């Protein structure tokens, strides 16, 4: 919570909700969703056959790009694909490296093996361009601006022929809706 307060100028109540409470909720929900996915099997197998679904990680890595203003989302975007067996390259927003760094230390202390989530702070171009150019890009997990996400889509579209698989792309952008 303290790193969120310092890094994102949140008060103690905002930081508690943002970094600790909601991240714990994400972890609980993600574990439940993972169990539900793995339990989904075809309801019928003909005699002498066994119909089954096998889930496996993507072939390559997932690029998690996290926002500047929400520590729990910054913790969720790299951990959700890692929980499903994927290797993740995590690029935090340049202005949220401090809280992201402490999340990464927490993951390591909890036993996350080296190389599962790889913390890559840096500018969007320095980190993003080589990642999006890699033939091993298998997925994007993004929260941030619409313009950045559109730029990523454009670059992926231009690179589509060189990727080993079609990248799966998940993004949340421009959450500026009003509430009445």
Task: Annotate the PLM regions.
Residues 1-38:
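Glycine-rich loop-to-alpha-helix module at the N-terminal edge of alpha/beta enzyme cores
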Residues 24, 32-180:
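Rossmann-like NAD(P) dinucleotide-binding subdomain of oxidoreductase/dehydrogenase enzymes
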């Amino acid at each position: 919570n303290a790193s969120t307060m310092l890094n994102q100028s949140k008060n103690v109540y905002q930081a508690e909700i943002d970094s600790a409470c909601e991240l714990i909720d994400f972890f609980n929900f993600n574990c439940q969703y993972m169990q539900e996915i793995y339990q989904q099997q075809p309801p019928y197998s003909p005699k002498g056959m066994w119909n089954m679904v096998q889930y496996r990680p993507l072939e390559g890595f997932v690029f998690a790009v996290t926002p500047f203003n929400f520590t729990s989302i910054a913790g969720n975007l790299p951990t959700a694909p890692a929980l499903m067996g994927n290797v993740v390259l995590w690029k935090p927003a340049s202005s949220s490296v401090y809280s992201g760094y402490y999340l990464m230390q927490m993951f390591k202390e909890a036993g996350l093996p080296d190389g599962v989530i790889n913390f890559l702070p840096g500018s969007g171009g320095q980190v993003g361009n080589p990642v999006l150019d890699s033939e091993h890009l298998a997925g994007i997990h993004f929260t941030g601006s619409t313009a950045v996400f559109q730029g990523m889509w454009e670059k992926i579209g231009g690179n589509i022929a060189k990727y080993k698989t079609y990248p799966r792309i998940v993004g949340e952008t421009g959450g500026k809706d009003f509430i009445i």
